[in-house]
Each structure stands twice: as structure tokens, then as C-alpha cells.
């Protein structure tokens, strides 16, 4: 939501900057481009004005600045000293304002896959490989999206195998410090393979969807499914620890555990 509001406000800001620069350069704003902080006439880079000067030109107090600013901000067309070059009804200053309210929510889509190893003796679980294919619409900043996915998967692995809040009968939290609250080490997070699809959303100007929770939400279910495939027993609660897996093995051997209806040897999920 905020990204689309920013985009709409920036478009207004750009239009305003081009109008002001067009008056200073005696050019049609439709013939102007902004490149590396400079407004220039398309096809004539010599006819240009820095964007910072455009910002000063839009300020009604521009003539209160120093002599250099005064020289840099003189219009080709004379104007009153207190009349900034903005369109009628616009506020002075190089600013843009807009509002955005989505017609309805957008939803990201994706697929997670994991390969795990469960030690036959200790029941320790190691995540060997993890892969994510994700579609959050148009990628505005691919590196940030990549970081969101990687960080989310790491958080999800912690929630699936390590992090657990333990309370006593009076409701007192017993593991309230990092001394006894388990979290995964970096060495316990596997290499995460990622790929991205871009299916723009038709519901907003930027065509974007969400990426914040897409890395973390599926992880527990995926790892549980992989453990089920390895052990052949139903996993119905997470996080899961080696001693819980060991007890499930004993229950399965005694015929007390819920059998898994999936054929053994299938590809881990």
C-alpha cells in the first residue's frame, strides 16, 4: 500500500519538476527527461538544469539565499520576487502528495521444497537443501526481495525445529533468555535456492504483491512433510524436536501412531 502511494506522489512530483524546468529552459515539459539528477531536453543534453536548482526555483524564499543561488535561479521570463513557478492552485516547493487505497488485497504465490535427513539413531533433523520459487508481482528491488525470502526461510527453520516457548503451571515463561531458548546457528541453515516469477497484480499502479511473509509461512509445513516422508509417520505439531520424533517412532512401533497414507520412497516435499 505504501509503495503505491509513494509511486503516485512521485509521479506528481516528477510532473511538477518538469513543468518548472520547462519554464526555466523555455521548453515543452513533454520534451524533457530526468537523468542522474539533471533535467535536460531530450536529444539536446546541453540544454539542462540540475534537479537541485529546480527545487530552489520552486521555493518562494529562493531570493533569500546567497548570491550564487540567486544567479542560478533566475528565470528567462521575469516573475515577481515572491511568485514561485508552480501551476495555479499548486503549493510552492518541489513536493508531491497523493493517496492510495487498494480496491482489495493482493496475494503472493510460491512453492517451497525441502530435503531433510533424519538420523536413524538420534532422530536429529538436518535440512540438506531448500528451494523457493516465488511470485510477488513486479520486483521493485530484487535484492531486498531475495533477502526477505532468505531471512524468512531461516526464521521458518527456527520455528520448525528449534524455537519453543516453555511455561510452568503458573504461566511463567521458563526459557526467557538466549541461554535456554534455542535458535538455529548460521551453519544449520542450508543454502537456499531461489527463483522469481513476475505476474503483475492488476489491482495497483505498480503491479506489486507481498513478499514479507512468503519466506517464513510455508517452512514448518514443508519440513513436517519431509520428515513424514522420511519416517512414514504423521507429524501434526511443530516445532518438533529429536526426542519427540523418537517418541513417535516408539508409538509407531507399538501401533499407537497415526499411519501415513503416502507411499514410502516418494520425493520429499
Residue ranges and their predicted role:
Residues 1-269:
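C-terminal catalytic domains of large/alpha subunits in multi-subunit enzymes
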